[in-house]
């Protein structure tokens, strides 16, 4: 059984697949504790492979985004094979601290300050920028695309982020690209 926080249908809001219709399977639980995490781990539903495949198949999109939390704590070859059997294209958003099962079609590593990265290759690297040394990620992880994402916080009831700082960094380091959380800008899931 898998602990699933939610399954929903929307547009991918981040990275290279921004704007692509996708079914999101958000797994509960994580091996890290990041202050900017937007996932509620307190509630989840236990689901079988068949339950997940059925829920995902209710939507027309081929892209399925396995996210969390940290999906590598739960995603296994059995689930990957079952989703491929119904012609789904699987993307995973991982912190890169755990091995992934074979068969994932698109890997996004979103490294965190508190975890030791073991994955060395990805389709993209997406870093939430909090002023840290991000160049080390380009040395540690081979990927065709590297994205910086502003860190959003709510202070005194007002949403703020470090967007200007991120833009300055990218302009000075043009191998990085900007990734905004467009789903939040558009006020969609």
Language-model regions, residue ranges each:
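Conserved Radical SAM active-site core
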Residues: 2-9, 21-24, 33-104
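A short beta-strand-turn-helix
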Residues: 10-15
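Conserved AdoMet/S-adenosylmethionine-binding subsite of the radical SAM
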Residues: 72-189
């Amino acid at each position: 059984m898998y602990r699933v926080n939610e399954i929903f249908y929307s547009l991918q809001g981040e990275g290279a697949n921004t704007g692509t219709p996708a079914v999101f399977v958000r797994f509960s639980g994580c091996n890290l504790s990041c202050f900017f995490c937007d996932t509620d781990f307190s509630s989840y539903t236990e689901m079988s492979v068949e339950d997940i495949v059925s829920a995902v198949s209710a939507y027309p999109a081929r892209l399925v985004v396995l996210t969390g939390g940290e999906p590598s704590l739960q995603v296994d070859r059995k689930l990957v094979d079952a989703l491929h059997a119904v012609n789904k294209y699987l993307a995973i958003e991982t912190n890169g601290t755990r091995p992934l099962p074979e068969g994932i079609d698109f890997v996004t590593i979103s490294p965190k300050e508190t975890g030791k990265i073991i994955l060395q290759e990805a389709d993209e690297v997406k870093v939430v920028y909090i002023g840290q040394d991000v160049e080390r990620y380009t040395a540690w992880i081979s990927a065709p695309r590297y994205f910086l994402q502003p860190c959003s916080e709510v202070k005194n009831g007002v949403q703020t982020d470090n967007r200007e700082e991120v833009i300055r960094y990218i302009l000075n380091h043009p191998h990085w690209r900007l990734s905004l959380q467009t789903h939040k800008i558009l006020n969609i899931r």
